[in-house]
UniProtKB/Swiss-Prot annotation:
HAMAP family: DarP
Protein name: Dual-action ribosomal maturation protein DarP
NCBIfam families, A to Z: PRK05255.1-1 (NF003593)
Biological process (GO), any one: assembly of large subunit precursor of preribosome
Similarity annotation: Belongs to the DarP family.
Gene3D superfamilies: PSPTO4464-like domains (1.10.60.30)
Keywords per UniProt: Cytoplasm, Ribosome biogenesis, RNA-binding, rRNA-binding
Amino acid sequence: MAEFHDDDAQFEEKSKSQIKRELHALQDLGERLTTLQPQLLERLPLTDPLRKAVLDAPKHKAHIARKRHIQYIGKLMRDQDVDAIVALIEQVDTSTRQYNERFHALERWRDQLIAGGDAALDAFVGEFPDCDRQHLRSLVRHAQHEAAHNKPPAAARKVFKYIRELDETKRGLR
């Protein structure tokens, strides 16, 4: 009778299911690469065949052809430094999320200024002391007038643009 005394050796090998999960994760990462913009792809440490395959992916329109191409990208991903790719993608996602959060905060400021009157204007000037209060009040008044007369929101866009410029100046982006 053969007895197994070396239990650690039994668990060192990956199961077939674990290998499949890892390969599917590589395919998912490869599919995520196909959604990135070309200038972001240039920053990734990809081999030439993988870069070409990722750039060729949008050409495959049919479902089966696209699926097959994603599987091919997953196969090419096996030879890549996946950690570096994941790190850069997470960095891009984080910066995009931060940009969107800041954008929505500025939209809320615009809406508060147009709806809120002097109290909202005072709060805004407290947050952005470099603001030209008279100019902003004029822009807000025009936006309120447009909203009251159901006109296109051109002045509201000008308010947003001015707020965005102030925010970029405050954050040192201008």
